[in-house]
Amino acid sequence: MLDLTKTQDAHIDQRLRSDVMIWLNSVRADGRPHSAAVWFLWDGSAFLIFSQPNTQKIRNLRQNTNVLLALDDTKNGSDVIQVEGKAELLEGNNEVSATLPAFVEKYGAMIKNMGSKPEDMAADYSQAIRITPTKFVGL
């Protein structure tokens, strides 16, 4: 979906690979929006996010899979990146956890600074979410 030969798309891809927080926006059953800052992995085609299983965002995604992801602005409004997508809750997939090498590489120092270990994070944040982009917006 991103054309890395285009400067703007390459910039979006670079930010998605290097930024450590992204805002996951979902919709509650009553139609009200919900926003949560989350850690994430971007592999070039989909996002992988881990959550505690009984959170508002998981309840939202069980009834509506439409999401909007947003990267924080870094240049006073000129570098906002939004991604519309469809979320899938990965149920019972023991192979996907916060102990993934790519996740530990990206967040290992932060996990350690929190006084935790990847295995503990994987146990606490056991619900994996895969988000497949449907539209990218770089402003």
Residue ranges and their predicted role:
Residues 30-32, 75-77, 119-123:
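A short beta-turn/loop motif at secondary-structure boundaries
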Residues 55-56, 94:
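A generic structural signal for alpha-helix starts
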Residues 1-21, 77, 113:
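Extreme N-terminal tail/first-helix region
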Residues 1-6, 80-139:
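Charged, gly/pro-rich active-site loop segments
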Residues 19-53, 59-61, 67-71, 81-82:
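Short beta-strand segments
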Residues 16-17, 62-63, 122:
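Alpha-helix boundary recognition
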Residues 8-12, 57, 99:
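Hydrophobic alpha-helical segments typical of transmembrane helices
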